[in-house]
């Protein structure tokens, strides 16, 4: 499916997301990193919020290699997604509430933040085996990527989800018919 940095391992513009975070979310992330002593993540968060450094500058100041920077960005993106979705493990009812708020998420936030929230919601729905609700998420992701190369990717996921839902419904219908015929056979003896 999708990795934490987006479909096809494309790097999300983390700088853009961090600069668009509201003060409450940003301060919450900062506090979390201070509590857990995640100095590198805190440095990356503050640096992206206040300036636009090149990856080479970050690598030299943190004294890490490029693959470590990629991992650090990926983990920071995951933390931002968790903070935006307000919880790491949600009940089915809370997930349904988030699905019902998809239009609010898309219209009240920037595209980057909306995509981050929706990909986290997609991950949670997949974990909880809530495939019917994924249609709504993929539809929203498809609309958000209308004029990008990712449109085709989300369109394919949407179509795949429709096929899955139709197949599931047909299988349930066939099972019901089989049980009805089996019951008629048993009663006819």
Residue spans for each PLM region:
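Flexible inter-repeat linkers and adjacent short helices
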Residues: 1-188
